[in-house]
Amino acid sequence: MKVHSLFLMAIFFYLAYTQLVKAQPRDDCQTRCGDVPIDYPFGISTGCYYPGDDSFNITCEEDKPNVLSNIEVLNFNHSGQLRGLIPRSTVCYDQQTNNDFESLWFRLDNLSFSPNNKFTLVGCNAWALLSTFGIQNYSTGCMSLCDTPPPPNSKCNGVGCCRTEVSIPLDSHRIETQPSRFENMTSVEHFNPCSYAFFVEDGMFNFSSLEDLKDLRNVTRFPVLLDWSIGNQTCEQVVGRNICGGNSTCFDSTRGKGYNCKCLQGFDGNPYLSDGCQDINECTTRIHNCSDTSTCENTLGSFHCQCPSGSDLNTTTMSCIDTPKEEPKYLGWTTVLLGTTIGFLIILLTISYIQQKMRHRKNTELRQQFFEQNGGGMLIQRLSGAGPSNVDVKIFTEEGMKEATDGYNESRILGQGGQGTVYKGILQDNSIVAIKKARLGDRSQVEQFINEVLVLSQINHRNVVKLLGCCLETEVPLLVYEFISSGTLFDHLHGSMFDSSLTWEHRLRIAIEVAGTLAYLHSYASIPIIHRDVKTANILLDENLTAKVADFGASRLIPMDQEQLTTMVQGTLGYLDPEYYNTGLLNEKSDVYSFGVVLMELLSGEKALCFERPQSSKHLVSYFVSAMKENRLHEIIDGQVMNEYNQREIQESARIAVECTRIMGEERPSMKEVAAELEALRVKTTKHQWSDQYPKEVEHLLGVQILSTQGDTSSIGYDSIQNVTRLDIETGR
């Protein structure tokens, strides 16, 4: 049993390691920096370059790619060479201090300088030292002597310029260049004020005595060749575990450690990607030797020359020669067999055509059945009977929805919940929408569903996700909404895809927008609507962090002559109104409770229900109310939002949240009152002070009773804020 466990563990680690070495870049990686293409194994961000080796990490600043901080990349190939620019090091003569010099060092990590580079010194009466640091330290250099300017067209042979070949050990992780000059430089300083030491690719620097000795023609960086490879092991050592992709092969690096990849003959591309090596079409690129009498046909990795019927290919000249003709045998049997085959094919094609027509008719009938079953006829009748109005419901087809979601591809899923699955859809006009595919529901509720579609399509509020239309030709109806790009409030507060950077101003504004939206739905919509599933996951944020209330799948319409409905309890734990949960009676105060939980989340940054918290504080409401009662609100408020200037606003918001989450619904304020109080929190301190002195005047101006806790009246001041708030709620947009 123990041996079996060890064997399984060994297989697990082997697979994990194989996955690591086979790692591939993300699909969204940046592929260019300025004019330089960036190909894997190099990359610009984490997950885009070969993992575990920062030598492949490219930093892109001002459209210039750099590797290892001070080496600018010009280009690189897949065979293990990188061409880059590195700065020179300089020493200048100064009469005060004799010398003013700088030395430069370069970090190499897993890169190494190619033997095709030369270490070069330009200057008179100077010498330069190259030092490497690693397991083996290495030093070399050269000296240049001259008291007068060298003659024009001089070579770099030790007079005004010297160069040397270097063989830098592979284990070197750092290289330093340092030029120096002799002490007495008065004889040369007028034509050679400074000396320069640098690496340069062989053939990329030609010494010009007068110009270079003066200022090196103002060149500050020189091209060099660097060698790179994958890891430290050979192809034999990593057989089956290298990162070479399909149609490629592994070869040992020429620098003595690691390996590189190359595409097989007949293929081209990036051999380090899983399918980077693609077939070369020799026929279209004219990389073939077929004669004019033969036809080139491309094959995978190669090609062949095809001769016309009646001729054969001469493999020496690759031309076509006539084939000796023979009289056909059994011509009668061939004719019979050919006729039988053709007849059989005609029968098969006819049967296939009939089956296709029957399948098309069946699908059409099924779509029509679903359309009627989902209330399509009722919807068309209601739309035609409504006459000219602001109802704008578009009925989409099943084919259009399938095409928009790429066949309901899992990669298009934006989210999943109790009400269904939401897909990202791209319509034929390239507009992006959110398509909600509901779960199978109660067929008896079709009329109510159609009513909700009609009512929701009339909601024209800037903080409600707009319903664009629906598709009724599927087994379950599809709803099409406008697409909101920046995720949900839950993602911003708790998710890993966003940094929690919402300021108090952002959070207060979001709370005001959501409260105003719910007040609009409760009080000013043509038919009052109770959302029934208010939570941070159903509040979307656009690119400006403007709140958009979404997911009305659980919503219910309240007839004008009723204040509440008896329904099957539905909602999300942590946000669910306890009174509604116990009685099944749904009214607008259920949304007030859920909004209070959302407000607590905005204030605390904590989840509504968290099993990682202690049992007594597992539910955010009890946790929050307890902190308020024990006067330790500061312990639960998110540290990113509270400061000395907004403590009063946060305390007032916390009080409103507690009022909204009272156990008895009748003790909770209405959303209209909540929206007014939250809007008032943005009033300046002077207005707050005025309202503290004249609370009756404030109450008269606001037109609503101010909420209070334990006799402490909250001032909301600002003589016109209620009118503004009411206008926002009533008009929507």
From Swiss-Prot:
Catalytic activity of the protein: L-seryl-[protein] + ATP = O-phospho-L-seryl-[protein] + ADP + H(+); L-threonyl-[protein] + ATP = O-phospho-L-threonyl-[protein] + ADP + H(+)
Coiled-coil region: none
EC number(s) stated in the UniProt entry for this protein: 2.7.11.-
Gene3D superfamilies assigned to the protein according to its UniProt record, in alphabetical order: Laminin (2.10.25.10), Phosphorylase Kinase, domain 1 (3.30.200.20), Transferase(Phosphotransferase) domain 1 (1.10.510.10)
GO cellular component terms, A-Z: membrane
Pfam families xrefs: EGF_CA (PF07645), GUB_WAK_bind (PF13947), PK_Tyr_Ser-Thr (PF07714)
Positions annotated as glycosylated: N57, N77, N110, N137, N184, N206, N218, N232, N247, N289, N314
Residue numbers on the Cytoplasmic membrane side: 352-733
Residues the record lists as Phosphothreonine modifications: T397, T567, T572
Domain Protein kinase: 408-691
Localization terms from the record: Membrane
Disulfide-bond pairs as recorded: C235-C250, C244-C261, C263-C277, C283-C296, C290-C305, C307-C320
Induction summary: Induced by INA.
Signal peptide extent: 1-23
Binding site for ATP: L414, G415, Q416, G417, G418, Q419, G420, T421, V422, K436
Modification sites for Phosphotyrosine: Y481, Y580
Similarity annotation: Belongs to the protein kinase superfamily. Ser/Thr protein kinase family.
Protein name, entry field: Wall-associated receptor kinase 5
Organism: Arabidopsis thaliana
Taxonomic lineage of the native organism: Eukaryota, Viridiplantae, Streptophyta, Embryophyta, Tracheophyta
Gene name of this polypeptide: WAK5
